[in-house]
């Protein structure tokens, strides 16, 4: 099938076959995928984000399930965001950490943390065997304009501290997109997932980017609840982005 992309060309969309849902074990899923061979893909990606799509490797996709519409694209309106009490505590708890934005180029230290995270979060699921090739394919891709937000413990004697988290982030003219975040399992008390989003918001604000895309939110799914705790959250209904009230709860 095809949708109109501009006044001259059509952008082709492909529909995948059904596959196991990554969120509900008793459901099947399928996706719409932008033509991965379209040479305009990098240029079209910012608009695709605004249409509710997301990047995984070189693929730009959106859930398109036959009997389920649970996956809702969400983003934060950066200038309107203000951290709540729980998020302020998260920032205070992590004020000793060193945060920097680096090139999206894999290091052995990042790969080791990625594998540690997957082995802890997804044991036996296939992802826990990922190596360097899968890291590059899944997180970096061939055409995206991405950066890594690194979070580290403080340096000691001018030696960089231990790497605690990496937030893979796509950069477009008007927005950032949170692609994937992985962090040290033994640092769970720091709520590094929430801290990474708070730092991405600050990054977007510094560079005058209007939105931070958070991917998909699923109402009632425990692993997705943290996204509702951010105020200035907007959801895409297939035609328009509309504001959502923030839910209350502790930072993950």
Curated annotation (Swiss-Prot):
Main location: cytoplasm
Enzyme Commission number(s): 2.3.2.29
Keywords: Acyltransferase, Cytoplasm, Transferase
Subcellular location per the Swiss-Prot or TrEMBL entry: Cytoplasm
Signal peptide region: none
GO molecular function per UniProt: arginyl-tRNA--protein transferase activity; leucyl-tRNA--protein transferase activity
Listed Pfam families: ATE_C (PF04377), ATE_N (PF04376)
Reaction(s) catalysed by this chain's protein: N-terminal L-glutamyl-[protein] + L-leucyl-tRNA(Leu) = N-terminal L-leucyl-L-glutamyl-[protein] + tRNA(Leu) + H(+); N-terminal L-aspartyl-[protein] + L-leucyl-tRNA(Leu) = N-terminal L-leucyl-L-aspartyl-[protein] + tRNA(Leu) + H(+)
Alphabetical list of InterPro entries matching this protein: Acyl_CoA_acyltransferase (IPR016181), Asp_Glu_LeuTrfase (IPR017138), N-end_Aminoacyl_Trfase (IPR030700), N-end_Aminoacyl_Trfase_C (IPR007472), N-end_Aminoacyl_Trfase_N (IPR007471)
A cellular component term, taken from the record's GO annotations: cytoplasm
A biological process from GO: proteasomal protein catabolic process
Tagged with keyword Metal-binding: no
Role, per record: Functions in the N-end rule pathway of protein degradation where it conjugates Leu from its aminoacyl-tRNA to the N-termini of proteins containing an N-terminal aspartate or glutamate.
Xref: NCBIfam families: PRK01305.1-1 (NF002341), PRK01305.1-3 (NF002342), PRK01305.2-3 (NF002346)
Family the entry assigns: Belongs to the R-transferase family. Bpt subfamily.
Stored PANTHER family: ARGININE-TRNA-PROTEIN TRANSFERASE 1, ARGINYL-TRNA--PROTEIN TRANSFERASE 1
Official protein name in the record: Aspartate/glutamate leucyltransferase
Gene name as annotated: bpt
């Amino acid at each position: 099938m095809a949708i109109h992309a501009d006044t001259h060309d059509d952008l082709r969309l492909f529909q995948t076959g059904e596959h196991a849902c990554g969120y509900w074990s008793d459901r099947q899923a399928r996706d719409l995928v932008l033509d991965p061979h379209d040479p305009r893909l990098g240029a079209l990606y910012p608009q695709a984000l605004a249409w509710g799509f997301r990047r995984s490797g070189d693929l730009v996709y959106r859930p398109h399930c036959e009997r389920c519409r649970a996956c809702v694209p969400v983003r934060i309106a950066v200038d309107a965001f203000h951290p709540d009490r729980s998020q302020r505590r998260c920032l205070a708890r992590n004020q000793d950490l060193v945060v920097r934005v680096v090139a999206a180029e894999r290091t052995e230290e990042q790969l080791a943390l990625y594998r540690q995270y997957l082995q802890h979060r997804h044991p036996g699921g296939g992802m826990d065997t990922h190596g360097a090739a899968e890291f590059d394919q899944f997180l970096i891709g061939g055409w995206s304009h991405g950066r890594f937000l690194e979070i580290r413990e403080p340096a000691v004697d001018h030696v960089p501290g231990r790497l605690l988290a990496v937030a893979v982030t796509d950069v477009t003219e008007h927005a950032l997109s949170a692609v994937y975040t992985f962090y040290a399992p033994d640092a769970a008390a720091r709520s590094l997932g929430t801290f990474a989003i708070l730092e991405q918001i600050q990054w977007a604000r510094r560079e005058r980017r209007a939105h931070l895309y958070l991917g998909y939110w699923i109402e009632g799914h425990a692993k997705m609840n943290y996204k509702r705790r951010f105020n200035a959250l907007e959801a895409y209904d297939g035609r328009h982005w509309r504001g959502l009230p923030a839910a209350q709860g502790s930072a993950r």
